[in-house]
Amino acid sequence: MAKPTISPGMQQYLDIKENYPDAFLLFRMGDFYELFYDDAVKAAQILEISLTSRNKNAEKPIPMAGVPYHSAQQYIDVLVELGYKVAIAEQMEDPKKAVGVVKREVVQVVTPGTVVESTKPDSANNFLVAIDSQDQQTFGLAYMDVSTGEFQATLLTDFESVRSEILNLKAREIVVGYQLTDEKNHLLTKQMNLLLSYEDERLNDIHLIDEQLTDLEISAAEKLLQYVHRTQKRELSHLQKVVHYEIKDYLQMSYATKNSLDLLENARTSKKHGSLYWLLDETKTAMGTRMLRTWIDRPLVSMNRIKERQDIIQVFLDYFFERNDLTESLKGVYDIERLASRVSFGKANPKDLLQLGQTLSQIPRIKMILQSFNQPELDIVVNKIDTMPELESLINTAIAPEAQATITEGNIIKSGFDKQLDNYRTVMREGTGWIADIEAKERAASGIGTLKIDYNKKDGYYFHVTNSNLSLVPEHFFRKATLKNSERYGTAELAKIEGEVLEAREQSSNLEYDIFMRVRAQVESYIKRLQELAKTIATVDVLQSLAVVAENHHYVRPKFNDEHQIKIKNGRHATVEKVMGVQEYIPNSIYFDSQTDIQLITGPNMSGKSTYMRQLALTVIMAQMGGFVSADEVDLPVFDAIFTRIGAADDLISGQSTFMVEMMEANQAVKRASDKSLILFDELGRGTATYDGMALAQSIIEYIHDRVRAKTMFATHYHELTDLSEQLTRLVNVHVATLERDGEVTFLHKIESGPADKSYGIHVAKIAGLPIDLLDRATDILSQLEADAVQLIVSAPQEAVTADLNEELDSEKQQGQLSLFEEPSNAGRVIEELEAIDIMNLTPMQAMNAIFDLKKLL
């Protein structure tokens, strides 16, 4: 790779770059990080920095761009945020002492999945994921947050589960072995927009790997460890022992389900506002914020664990003043997990240690407040709080409260902590006085009224004499430097004091650095205890947050039953209620007895069907988090999964059409749901032709009713399906109530028993502002279509979708009955033409022409 005219320094760059072809290489040269060749060209464009060249007079100048080392982090952040890797090559020796080319090495590779430092700190997790498989059917998956040390692994039995888990973790980088198929690599990189990093080597750390894991879990975890070790280039004492988890230990929800329910962010805005996380977040610590997101993402299925959380929330609700004191104390707690990680990375500065010390000063008070509740329910957290008084004393005794972030400029260690350091400081302090005395003495003796002593790094201490006073300079002064309008002088006495002061200053700075490094090393020995403390404080924080929200919004403690019944009295959609206000929101009760599995919901668009379904889902999620819920009374079974199809959105991940996504999500539900699951389908089948959609909707309802037996809400605009209640014994009809008066329709947003008698679609079109003559014609067409209404085919209840269905259809045709798949006269053609019309983009004239064409078909 070497070139004949290349300099030794550039050859060093090329040699290092050869080992990091997939990363931007930041090459430290003095006060700058330089980039060369293609890296420079690309970085200049992305970072909007100047592109210059090295050896400008050469035949082929080398493209070059650079960023100042002290502000490099902001540029690294930009590159990593865009999905790039950045290798940082530092100078490993003092350039002044180097013989030949300064030795340089890559000290860290920053990747999207290994971010520890950032100019835009975020309390959210940043997970790096590794997957491994031998047969492409069963997969080991491990994930880690390098910034907190969290490390977990699981076994998944199909790639769809892998995809869903990666999406749920919001991972941006995946570590895989070379044996993963190209098809799956394509799915990860192209369709899911993930950075793929390859790692076939494994790092076996007996302190971090649990031998009870399966071979695939161990393989994925060890590849993850090897990748982190290779990119971070140091031992990381904060990494926790890998914890095995099972998907089935939590309420299972796909990424699409969580997205449609606005759990962690508002799906329409991609912002926190309007999400369940936004509603429930009254946390006071960064660790609590992360844990709250995890609890929302993974509600429990264990009744015992749910009850533990409920009991503590109840205590917090019963003792307002103590809880208020607790909340105030939590405000003084910094991000223990990430402070511990910075210590492990060797990046913790004096301010970081001060924050840790201040946090540890708060812990005894937090423990005392929790004990003051005097409630046994809190023992589970109180007994885990480790106050670590010796560590708190070390930090707050050693680190000066005014210490800055830098560790090389002194004034970071408290006076009295080290005797030798105090001696150096005495010399420096007294030396300052000695210098002031010399200045006063020489000013008086020389008669130079403006004589003063200044200092700079080049000349040290010197007397500053202007040209107008040069004739008064004493003989014992010696010249140190000549300037345009003045000269600098020294004396033997000043030089002696200077030597003592500068020696003391250098020794003091070096000793402070050494002391700080020793203190930081002692802090590192507490990392595991700090991480356990962080988990406990985070748990307390989340529980007080849920208590505050429950109190503010008058939530109730849900009950749970084994009878597979749902009883919700005056339930509310929690986030909609907060946005609208409790006075404006119209509550709805929801009842499923043990003999009811399906609610078929009919009613106009915009009337509240989707909100009603989401209300149930959020109530289940909040309840199984261990929290209180938005209703007057709630009694639920413990669900194992929630499956939804709510909202007509295309799949932004894989580029599938609305109808294809509907069918894929319906497939996941009918294949994976159990009788302990909750299914919510909104207008399933609308993405295809009317008869196809109705046929699929009916057969899916029958399949769920006869085989799956999951609690299901099925909203539909196919009113013919309401007749299924006569054949399917565990299906009931409900509808959204409306008030019709003097030709005007009001949606009451109230759910009532029985089917809707009308769809009011034309009324919704009227609200949207369509032309009156078009609406009148639509009313006429609707009347004719209703006169030729399609009759419902009810299949035998024992098999929802079987080969016998075709025989039944043939039999009905022979008897002259209209089939679900048989269009009466030209009604189907009219419907298809209507569906194809883009109403929102029609001019009045185009609308009239369209109606004229439709009329000719009838």
Curated annotation (Swiss-Prot):
Binding site for ATP: 603-610
GO CC list: cytosol
Transmembrane segments: none
Pfam families: MutS_I, MutS_II, MutS_III, MutS_IV, MutS_V
CDD domains (alphabetical): ABC_MutS1 (cd03284)
Keyword Metal-binding in annotation: no
GO MF terms, alphabetically ordered: ATP binding; ATP-dependent DNA damage sensor activity; damaged DNA binding; mismatched DNA binding
Function: This protein is involved in the repair of mismatches in DNA. It is possible that it carries out the mismatch recognition step. This protein has a weak ATPase activity.
Protein name: DNA mismatch repair protein MutS
Gene: mutS
